[in-house]
Amino acid sequence: MELQPPEASIAVVSIPRQLPGSHSEAGVQGLSAGDDSELGSHCVAQTGLELLASGDPLPSASQNAEMIETGSDCVTQAGLQLLASSDPPALASKNAEVTGTMSQDTEVDMKEVELNELEPEKQPMNAASGAAMSLAGAEKNGLVKIKVAEDEAEAAAAAKFTGLSKEELLKVAGSPGWVRTRWALLLLFWLGWLGMLAGAVVIIVRAPRCRELPAQKWWHTGALYRIGDLQAFQGHGAGNLAGLKGRLDYLSSLKVKGLVLGPIHKNQKDDVAQTDLLQIDPNFGSKEDFDSLLQSAKKKSIRVILDLTPNYRGENSWFSTQVDTVATKVKDALEFWLQAGVDGFQVRDIENLKDASSFLAEWQNITKGFSEDRLLIAGTNSSDLQQILSLLESNKDLLLTSSYLSDSGSTGEHTKSLVTQYLNATGNRWCSWSLSQARLLTSFLPAQLLRLYQLMLFTLPGTPVFSYGDEIGLDAAALPGQPMEAPVMLWDESSFPDIPGAVSANMTVKGQSEDPGSLLSLFRRLSDQRSKERSLLHGDFHAFSAGPGLFSYIRHWDQNERFLVVLNFGDVGLSAGLQASDLPASASLPAKADLLLSTQPGREEGSPLELERLKLEPHEGLLLRFPYAA
């Protein structure tokens, strides 16, 4: 019979002890006859051997248990008979022997019960017939551990591939097939590499060139803010450098880049001897106050430009009879205040200074000799283009403020003519834009055009220059007893405490700061756009026709976002007929542009507007933007 063990099974082979109950009586007789306990045990074992020799079938596990129980009863009965027939001493000795023997036999019998339960699995190694079972020493299967592989996959894994040896690998690598394959792959690699290199070269060659950014100074990046009268700027009962220091946060909110301050030096009206450009008038503060103001302004990225116009309290700003003396004083003052840390200077009314061009050239050399980052501003009341150009010819980096645009009238065509003529005459020179050298916008413009001019000044190529109060539309004519050139700044409704109702909330800084549609809010937005957009910072300028009464132009720089400005100076609504034929290919107009802001309320900002159907309200200005298109 072929042995078929289960997976990972263990075959058990043992020789059990049998205590058949049918032959236990002989053991009892031996005990009752006075034999010792060893004889009784021997009889029980002998009876078991006789049972094995008889050839009877092996009892089952339950029968074995019955036999063991019957045998135990017989042994107990034999013990009782022994007690009845023996003397006490012998009884005690026999009792101890029987008790020990029974304890040992009981322990053995319990183990035999456990072994007999496994009997069906313990068959003879060679059980061809029942006769073989009669042999007392018949061989039975013992405990044999057989380890069987779990499955064929495990057997296959045992014989896994260990790879080629070095000699085998070299032999295969040198075969003709692999040699051809390696050459083919190497050729494909270099062809791919050369293709990518050629593609990169083509992209670089055909890509549009990025324009080099022009060198820019700090005054190129934003507006300048003039405070000619400290007392008027700070209001009644104030007007010193310490008070101005407290207003620097307000100037910072306007996003202005420079503060044009003063004059604040000592000046006796029309007395050159009592005019000291090196000393600060005690009414305004001390040198220490000025130094503190400089440090605080620099922390807020605001540059300080000092006005050194000598006779600012007199009739003639330059003491016409003592020009050389005054020129020497100015020269000394430039060197002194440069050392003190100022960022530039302003001199006004230079049309009253004899040989102004030569003096300006000398002062410019002193300023630039100290640092290229220092600025000189000259102011004139002239609106004549030729006179303005004569002042600019010999002074390359001079920034000039004038009344040139104050004669613009109220038509878009005339304003367009003035701007384009000025830009063409000055060429590549950096310009500045204002309506005067010191006065407010309201001195030249009606209230309905203030927003329009703010938009224009912030978007023309150059530096916009404003006076304090221009951001809120400060109008001296609307205030009782105020001078035209320096009215009191309206911070809140308490600016005129002696005249109740003289100032309304919408006229003040406080009231307009809370109104997103106010002139002040528009000023701040335009100033912010002007300082961060490349096209507005140093972009090209192209004016083009848009229809009667309109002034339109485009600002663009390289591949940056473009800005379109359309201004309606008229008193009626107009339709803009934007003619892109006037523009170069680099400044072509799209069909639509997004509205960035309008000077009039009611338009949805960010909405696309069709340029062919563009309509403007009276005195409305639009700032639109559109992306670069190759």
UniProtKB/Swiss-Prot annotation:
Tissue occurrence: Expressed ubiquitously in all tissues tested with highest levels detected in kidney, placenta and testis and weakest level in thymus. During gestation, expression in the placenta was significantly stronger at full-term than at the mid-trimester stage. Expressed in HUVECS and at low levels in resting peripheral blood T-lymphocytes and quiescent fibroblasts. Also expressed in fetal liver and in the astrocytic process of primary astrocytic gliomas. Expressed in retinal endothelial cells and in the intestinal epithelial cell line C2BBe1.
Region called Disordered, residue ranges: 15-39
Residues that carry a glycan: N365, N381, N424, N506
Any Pfam family: Alpha-amylase
Residue stretches spanning the membrane: 185-205
GO molecular function per UniProt: aromatic amino acid transmembrane transporter activity; cadherin binding; double-stranded RNA binding; exogenous protein binding; L-alanine transmembrane transporter activity; L-leucine transmembrane transporter activity; neutral L-amino acid transmembrane transporter activity; protein heterodimerization activity
A GO cellular-component term linked to this record: extracellular exosome
InterPro entries: Glyco_hydro_13_cat_dom, Glyco_hydro_b, Glycoside_hydrolase_SF, SLC3A2, SLC3A2_N
Biological role stated in the UniProt entry: Acts as a chaperone that facilitates biogenesis and trafficking of functional transporters heterodimers to the plasma membrane. Forms heterodimer with SLC7 family transporters (SLC7A5, SLC7A6, SLC7A7, SLC7A8, SLC7A10 and SLC7A11), a group of amino-acid antiporters. Heterodimers function as amino acids exchangers, the specificity of the substrate depending on the SLC7A subunit. Heterodimers SLC3A2/SLC7A6 or SLC3A2/SLC7A7 mediate the uptake of dibasic amino acids.
Protein name: Amino acid transporter heavy chain SLC3A2
Organism: Homo sapiens
Encoding gene (name): SLC3A2
